[in-house]
Structure formats: structure tokens, C-alpha cells
Amino acid sequence: MIAEVQEKTISSSPSIISEEEALQILKGEVPLLPVVAKASEERFRHFGNRVRIHILDNIKNGYCPEDCGYCAQRKGGESGIQEYSLKSPEEIWEDAKKAKENGAYRFCMVTSGRGPTDKAVDKLAETISKINGELGMKVCLSAGILDGKKAKTLKDAGLDRYNHNLNTSESKYNEICSTHTFKDRLTTLEAAKEAEIGLCSGIIVGMGEELKDIVQVAFELKRLGVISIPVNFFIPIKGHAIQKSTLTPEFCVRVLSVFRLVNPDSEIRVGAGREGHLGFLQSMALYVANSLFAEGYLNVKGSEMEQTMNLIRDCNMVPEFTEGIPEGWEDYDSKFLYDEKNFPELYKHKK
């Protein structure tokens, strides 16, 4: 293994493009390949050929008082999801160990609800401290609205990142949620930043927004100094208030490129919808983004770890673990692709 990776906590590199240029890219006024080439140049400048794999742990599902139109756990939603209260520290610990064994760079705990109580924060802090101390694993928490006191408690426990997505622009926000505001989200991010927790915040593309909304989010995240940006592509499933999504793989790559060019030194993560919306352009996306999720999302299945590792190998890239890059990864051998499991027709006459 190489030495432990040292991460920045605040994005500091200036944007490569202006708002007007970002709009031109999204409108398709600039050919795709030159855009990807420029975005890829920045990706490799700051992250080399490394890819960070994140695994989500949905530690509380449902029972949410918020009415976010993009969420299957929303108040009044009829998604049929399995609802459960906050997992025990023992359950979360076992999930973290499994994520570590599977090669996750960061363990992301997600809980439903408006925000955690003081008691819940204390329990989460205890769990974070154990994962950090005994597994040496980086931890990200997404638990809703947070104030300064709770943020400090989590920071003192060793929390590496706090996730609170902007999801869309301020002008669009009241169309997707009425139980809290865009300002509430900004206040939470500012509280986490004040506590010196690295910020993780991104967008959900495909909820009926205009191109200018996407650009506004990209530059708002830059203003906040967000160092980790998940770019999600909306998946309309039962229970969502929003049911339409018209995205193409080519457009999704353009979106990822815009976020990279606006936030050159931020971790750009291909989030939910990677498999369905990017399709055969998933490999191209990795030349722009340097991070992705494996083993699924909150209430939607995704690529398993083996598929994700194969994608990384095919791009001649390497997975970045908490301790660094595993030895021997460069010894790429494609013969495993042609085993009986993947190509049974080649073996059907085998004696």
C-alpha cells in the first residue's frame, strides 16, 4: 500500500469556465469530446488515475416528515419501501466492516428525517469515533438539518464529511419541497464548514429544472468551497412526487464536465442513476469524475462491487482505498472476463 491519502477540506482552485460557457456546454453548442478532454485534464491534474468508491449505509429508512418530491421516503409517499428506525451501533459497525472489506474508500451513513436530535447525534458520534479509530476509515454522514453545536460534536468524534445536497437552485427549490427551504440547506452547510468538517453537497439532475438551474448550483457549490460533489441523475420510482425524467447519456456527461470545470479540485462523484442514465458512457464519465457509488443507493439497486471494479480496470484506473492504492492492482489480466460465469456459451461443449 502507498501512504495514506491526504485530502483537502475546502475547494480552492479557480473555475476554468464562466457561467455563460457552462450554459453553452449544456446546450450542446460545444462538441462533447473537446469538453471531456478539458474536464479530464483537470480531473487527472488533481486526482491522477485514482477512483474513490463510496458505499452508502441507509441507517434509518422512512418515517420522514419532509415532503421532498424526489424521495421515496417522503411524507405521504406510497412507495412501499421498508421503513425502520435508526440502526443500532452494532448493526452500523458490521455494515462499516463489510464496506471496508469490499474496498470502500469512504463509508457514507444516511438517515431520513428533518435532522438528528441531540441524543441521536451523541449515538452517531460514538459510532463514528469507533469506525474512525478501529477501522481507520473515512466517514461521511447525511442526517439532515444541523446546527453548530451538533456539527462540533460530530467533528470532535472524527467525522470526515457532512453531506447535505442543494439538489437544485434556490429559484427552483420551492417546487420540489415545501417543508424546508434552500436557505435551511445553506445554513446547515455553513454550520458544518464552521466546524471544519469537509462539505459534501451536490445536485439531482432531471427534475424539470432549466439549464441555468444546473449552472447556478455548480457555482453556488464553488462559492461554498464544497470539496465533494455527488452528481445524481433522477430516477423516477413509485412514491416520488416527480415522475418524469428526460436525460440522455451524452447530456449526463456534459453535466459532469460542467461540475468538474467549475470545481476543478473537488471530488466529483457519479451518483444515483449512473447505471441507467449513463449506460454505455459510464466509462467516459470516469474520465471526468473521480468517484462513484457501489452496491446501490438508498432505495434503488446499483452496480455491485465486482462490476464497479471491472469498470475502473477497463478505464486503466485504480481504486483508492483509505490506506492508498492496493499493491498488484496494475497487474491487469483480462482472462477472468472470459471465464465460464461471464461467457457460458463458450463452455457449453466443455467436457
UniProtKB/Swiss-Prot annotation:
Q: Which domain of life is it from?
A: Bacteria
Catalytic function, reaction form: (4R,5S)-dethiobiotin + (sulfur carrier)-SH + 2 reduced [2Fe-2S]-[ferredoxin] + 2 S-adenosyl-L-methionine = (sulfur carrier)-H + biotin + 2 5'-deoxyadenosine + 2 L-methionine + 2 oxidized [2Fe-2S]-[ferredoxin]
List residues binding [4Fe-4S] cluster.
64, 68, 71
Its GO biological process terms?
A: biotin biosynthetic process
Is S-adenosyl-L-methionine there in the keyword field? yes
Listed InterPro entries? Aldolase_TIM, BATS_dom, Biotin_synth/BioAB, Biotin_synthase, Elp3/MiaA/NifB-like_rSAM, rSAM
**Binding locations of [2Fe-2S] cluster:** 108, 140, 200, 269
A single GO molecular function term of this UniProt record = 4 iron, 4 sulfur cluster binding
The pathway where this protein functions is:
Cofactor biosynthesis; biotin biosynthesis; biotin from 7,8-diaminononanoate: step 2/2
* Obligatory cofactor(s): [4Fe-4S] cluster; [2Fe-2S] cluster
Q: Which Pfam families match?
A: BATS, Radical_SAM
Q: What task does this protein carry out?
A: Catalyzes the conversion of dethiobiotin (DTB) to biotin by the insertion of a sulfur atom into dethiobiotin via a radical-based mechanism.
Q: How does it assemble?
A: Homodimer.
What name does UniProt use for this protein? Biotin synthase
Gene from which this protein is expressed: bioB
